[in-house]
Amino acid sequence: MSDATYIEIKSLYKVFGGQPKSILPRIEAGESKQKILDETGHTVGLKDINLTIKRSEIFVIMGLSGSGKSTLVRHFNRLIEPTQGQILVEGEDVLQLNKAHLQEFRRQKMSMVFQHFGLMPHHTVLENVAFGLKTQGVAKGERNRKASKWLADVGLDGYEQQYPAQLSGGQQQRVGLARALCTDADI
């Protein structure tokens, strides 16, 4: 597989608050996050993030609690819209995708494991894992087969008809992982 650039983030900023673009000059002038928060009520989430991820590269984003890891990753598929910057996946500007193309991008290109798992409590473990395939329009038999395979791969064979509340936190996390892997998304 080629080592060509797959994801590129250029000059990404995220400011939370009522007028985020008005804060950019203060950030660029070097004012601290705390001063900006104290004086404007705006929170600087991301400041001038630039990164390149190659195809087939394992890329780790790590940092202290509250440092912006989840905020950054949620920008990749526009679960959070940036204040400024560019997000390219295979050279395509994700910020330029219309609603229909963005929905297709999210269904086909990217899967996420959320910090709090995001499991649907009134659906079985099998239904939770198969959910992404359902949104892709995969037939029920095929999605259940794939979901069962991934449940077995994460050590939860036999738990298909259980509900999330019946599982430990670690088991719930594995359900979230199986759901993300089940769609065979590129990212």
Identify the meaning behind each predicted range.
Residues C182-D186:
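A short, proline-enriched helix->beta-strand linker immediately N-terminal to the Walker B motif
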